Each structure stands twice: as C-alpha cells, then as structure tokens.
C-alpha cells in the first residue's frame, strides 16, 4: 500500500490520533521500519505513555533506531487529577507508568517531550512544566 504514496512530500510521519498508537505497537514498528528504510522522514509518536502497561512489557527499547521523537501527553500534575481527567483503564498505576515510560524512552529515542492541553488550570500547567523539567524533557502547552 505504501508504494502508492509519495512520502517524500513530507518531513515527518506522526503516529497519533483518537486512540493510542501503541495499542498496535507491532504494526506501528513494522510500518515505521519500512518508512525509515525507504524515505528520509523523521518518525514521531504522540502517546499517552502507557505503552508498557498496554503491551505488558518494557517497550521503550523497541523504539531505538526506529522512532526519532516521542511526545508524551502528561495531561495533569498528579495521579489524582490525571485519573479524574483521563479515566485510564489501568487505574491508579497509569500516572506513574506514564512518568516511568518518559524516563525510560529518553534512553532510546533522541527527542522526547511532554505536553498538556491548555484547558487545565494554569497552576496545574505550571506544576506539569515542573514535572517535565524534573524529567529533563521539553514541555509544550497545546
């Protein structure tokens, strides 16, 4: 199917959207490897950071050499606020797993950042900015 697309018209391929791209991690990696081998494109994943919980194993090492950047949706400044906003199917373990994934993926992917949506309270945004700074990753309000 990809042979019909002129991917050279683009600079970056982003795996994101309504739903979590790492729910289909094997497919994501297969496509990313093929794109990497046949184009100049940079490859980014926009993720909720719950890939390890979703896949039942550490997943950050699988991204090495395949993914150029990862943007993790931090979403909130505490586990309680995160759970209230996101309702993760993994319950109270989700927030810490997302933070751990962010720490881990920095060892395998050249560019890692965190983001929040600008509709949460300003003081929460600033706390999120501090969390990203503690993790030594760029922070963006979207």
Which ranges hold each PLM region?
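Aromatic/hydrophobic pocket-lining residues that form the small-molecule binding cavity
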Residues: 28, 98, 125
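Non-cysteine beta-strand/loop elements that form the S-adenosyl-L-methionine
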Residues: 66-78, 140-142
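Conserved Radical SAM active-site core
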Residues: 1-66, 78
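Catalytic cores of alpha/beta
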Residues: 57-62, 119-134
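Conserved radical SAM core fold
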Residues: 21-22, 49-53, 72-89, 121
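A cross-domain feature marking catalytic cores of carbohydrate-active enzymes
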Residues: 17, 45-49, 74, 116-118, ...
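Conserved strand-turn element in the central/C-terminal portion of the radical SAM core barrel
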Residues: 46-52, 87-89, 101-124, 128
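Surface-exposed amphipathic alpha-helices with a cationic face
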Residues: 29-39, 102-110, 129, 133
């Amino acid at each position: 199917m990809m042979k019909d697309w002129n991917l050279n018209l683009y600079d970056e391929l982003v795996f994101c959207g309504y739903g979590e791209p790492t729910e289909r991690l094997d497919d994501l990696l297969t496509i990313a490897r093929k794109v990497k081998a046949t184009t100049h494109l940079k490859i980014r994943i926009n993720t909720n950071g719950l890939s390890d919980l979703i896949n039942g194993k550490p997943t950050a090492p699988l991204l090495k050499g395949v993914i150029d950047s990862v943007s993790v949706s931090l979403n909130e400044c505490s586990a309680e606020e995160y759970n209230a906003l996101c309702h993760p199917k993994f319950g109270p373990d989700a927030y810490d797993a997302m933070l751990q994934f962010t720490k881990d993926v920095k060892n395998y992917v050249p560019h890692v950042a965190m983001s929040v949506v600008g509709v949460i309270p300003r003081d929460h945004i600033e706390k999120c900015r501090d969390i990203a700074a503690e993790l030594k990753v760029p922070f963006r309000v979207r």
